[in-house]
A protein has these predicted regions:
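N-terminal Rossmann NAD(P)H-binding glycine-rich loop of SDR-like oxidoreductase domains
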Residues: 3-23
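Structural signature of the Rossmann-like NAD(P)-dependent dehydrogenase/reductase core
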Residues: 5-6, 82, 120-123, 131, ...
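N-terminal Rossmann-fold cofactor-binding loop
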Residues: 30-35, 63
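NAD(P)H-binding glycine-rich loop region in Rossmannoid oxidoreductase-like domains
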Residues: 57-101
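Conserved Rossmann-fold NAD(P)-dependent oxidoreductase catalytic core, especially the SDR/UDP-sugar
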Residues: 80-82, 86, 107-148
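NAD(P)-dependent short-chain dehydrogenase/reductase
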Residues: 135, 158-212, 217-228, 259-261
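Active-site helix of classical SDR
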Residues: 152-155
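C-terminal substrate-binding subdomain of Rossmann-fold SDR/epimerase-dehydratase oxidoreductases
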Residues: 200-201, 205-315
Length: 315
């Protein structure tokens, strides 16, 4: 398949590209002009080989001008993965104007995907769309986002699906839960724990009593590939285009933190209750991943402890 991917150097984008290249696909990796993170794509063996073989194409283009992609990508493409989204950190999630701009650009990206001949459009939504819940979250669970970020992602789910139907494309909306692994953002909980515990430092945390779920980045990348490769007939009649993408291990967040602490040989310490919650507040993550497993055959393979060990080894 010929696949276009925005947010190509992001944590999720880079992992998805590596997975797709390793499985023989051709990728147009859309990056910001003068991006300083190209090494995330070209530094891996899969990227180096694909560049030599002409299966990896680096396309410089601003997220706000997706219409220009038709001038930079020659020929027809099969699918489009839109991982590009400005301001995903906790602080930027409350910025309504930025999130409105993200939504507008994303809808224009759908139109660009159609112009490129794509038949399938994957969008990276977020668990932040669900808001506060105390019970298991299925794709049918009512959404009540608590930030401008979650609200914009939810609006894209509705408007993006409608636009894709109008243009004759299959819309697939990934609700991604907490991903971790090599290349993760330095401000995430897992990375903060690893920094503190390997550096023998104290880490300020919330109460960490809520239920949580993590997915290792390679498993997430495989889920993206599964949703791209699954035949169209498998999606017929499902109605709701949302797919939860998460791990299969849900437990109190504190247990995950303590497991990281043990794997870091007990260095440093945890100051529970010392930190205020993020933009969405203290949410419970209890995802149901039955739908994606049933329709695509994908399932998470990496146990949390195994993923932490791999992340430590990559440092």
């Amino acid at each position: 398949m010929r696949i276009v991917i925005t947010g190509a150097t992001s944590f999720v984008g880079a992992a998805a590209i590596q997975e797709l290249l390793e499985n023989g696909h051709e990728v147009y990796a859309v990056v910001r002009p003068s991006s300083r993170k190209l090494e995330t794509l070209t530094g891996q063996e899969a990227g180096k080989n694909a560049l030599r073989e002409g299966r990896l194409h680096i396309v410089e283009n601003d997220l706000s001008a997706p219409e220009l992609l038709t001038e930079k990508i020659q020929g027809s493409c099969d699918a489009f993965c839109h991982f590009g989204w400005g301001g995903s950190g906790s602080g930027a999630r409350t910025g309504e104007q930025l999130q409105e701009e993200n939504l507008r650009a994303s809808l224009n990206t759908v139109r660009a995907a159609k112009a490129l001949g794509c038949r399938r459009f994957l969008f990276s939504g977020s668990q932040a769309e669900y808001g506060m819940h105390q019970t298991r979250m299925t794709e049918e669970t009512e959404c009540a986002p608590r930030s401008a970020y979650g609200e914009a992602k939810l609006r894209m789910r509705r408007q993006g699906e409608a636009l894709c139907k109008e243009l004759g494309m299959r819309y697939i909306h990934l609700r991604i839960f907490s991903a971790y692994g090599p290349g993760d953002h330095p401000w995430t909980l897992v990375e903060s724990c690893l920094d503190a515990f390997t550096g023998n430092a104290a880490l300020s945390l919330g109460a960490c009593t809520q239920k949580w779920n993590f997915i290792y980045i390679t498993d997430l990348a495989k889920a993206v590939r599964a949703l791209l490769e699954t035949p169209e007939t498998a999606f017929e009649g499902i109605g709701n285009p949302v797919f939860n993408v998460a791990g299969d291990d849900t437990r109190p967040l504190k247990e995950f933190v303590e497991e990281i602490h043990r794997l870091c040989k007990g260095g440093g310490s945890c100051l529970y209750g010392d930190r205020k919650e993020n933009a969405e507040g203290a949410v419970n993550l209890i995802p149901d991943i039955g739908k994606i497993c049933r329709i695509t055959g994908w399932k998470p393979e990496t146990a949390f402890g195994e993923g932490i060990k791999k992340t430590l080894e990559s440092r």
